[in-house]
């Protein structure tokens, strides 16, 4: 423990004693100042004496010095002020130049953004490796399939129908049959489904379908006994699939009409998120392939055996985009929303297509005046707020687009009024045995809970056929390279065999040179030629024997007599005979034994006759 400090407390006697001494000291100082005032008075400048002869000149000189000092001080002050003003002007000029430069940069950025908006609202992937891979997989499915099922979204069938793919199939693969599957019929009114079926059946056989939405892995439910387009609301709202029975019957009719004894291969193509994988799972009644709401979930072709007669091929989603991309492509859920640069523009398109009453009923918000006002209210309701209490409009817009593609905002499109008759339909209908009669003559369209969109001639996205052509060229180049590699391998194998034969011949010749003279070598070469000729003849006889219908002709001793002689010579010289030659030799030996037995029997008979004659 440290040493304690002394206390500062003191007695009152000592305290007052100190105060008295201090007061006494102050009195003494005041008394001394009064008694000696000259010591404390400051001396004044006496100035120039009056008796100084040049007093006036001296005063003028002093005055001039004062004026000069004041002028110098004033000049310094003015110079300092001018310097500050010049520096301020330089700062203003630099600031103006900097502002002008930043303004030009801002204008350039705005022009670049405007160009990007005109060219497309999202970062276009182009012909990258993944897109080429998707097209290769789609091409494999089209080439392998006997029947091509193009799955369409019932809400916008023409928007997700790829006419370029259909044209390519009809031109390149004339033996392929195209069938349209109108999926997701539970998301649109029944009248609209019937109208679209009536329109699409003017081009290809078309079936309505509803995929299963059950979550279990096996034993997915199926409903049958009724046409899907005529099903009740309870059947449409259930989780079981509709239309599987009609589709399977159509495929069986196709195989029966063309007398196909093997299994029918069915290729399934379509835009992303139209329900291709869900269609396969509904037909298989198990979760055979994975499904997801993100475009591009299926990346490779997948084969699923439905039964011994039907084989299904799943393919990646087709994105046949060659030109610019507008809001319609984004609203069809063809591209990933994370890559969309301006998701507010598609939301503006959604609000323009739907009535405000419908939007207010769905999102339960107050009336809005603009798209930004709508997104701000939805962001506040869904708590999409960023730092500073600002609404996150981008993420809110993406969520609204997902509501549109996911079915939370119901909508449907009207088919065109002008129907284009097609000559291909009758041909397909006869082979597939599908009834193409008109379902209804007139239908009503009075449903306010849906966003009804009038049909506009859609700007069909052009398919970049160069991807398929490049794939063909690459396949041909690969085939040529493989053929060249096979030829090179065969040539190398032939050269290796010849080298081995030459080495064996050299070894045999060396041995013969050591054991015999030149005459023996000549004889050996002659024998070698005979062996080669015999081997060739044996090979020819073996190939001919496979084509003979009569089994007895294969081992005819008369036709193989020359071969028998040659094999005997080989056996005497080398002690080896080939398997085919050995078989012929065995047959010939058996024939010789039979002949020898007959001769011996004849000799015995002759001896018996001679003995009889002797007796």
Swiss-Prot record:
Residues 1-126, 460-615 are annotated as: Disordered. Pfam families: GN3L_Grn1, MMR_HSR1. Signal peptide: none annotated. Residues 35-46, 54-111 have a biased composition (Basic and acidic residues). This is Guanine nucleotide-binding protein-like 3 homolog. One of its GO terms (cellular component) is nucleolus. One of its GO terms (molecular function) is GTP binding. It comes from the Eukaryota. GTP binds at residues 183-186, 270-277, 314-317. The gene is gnl3.
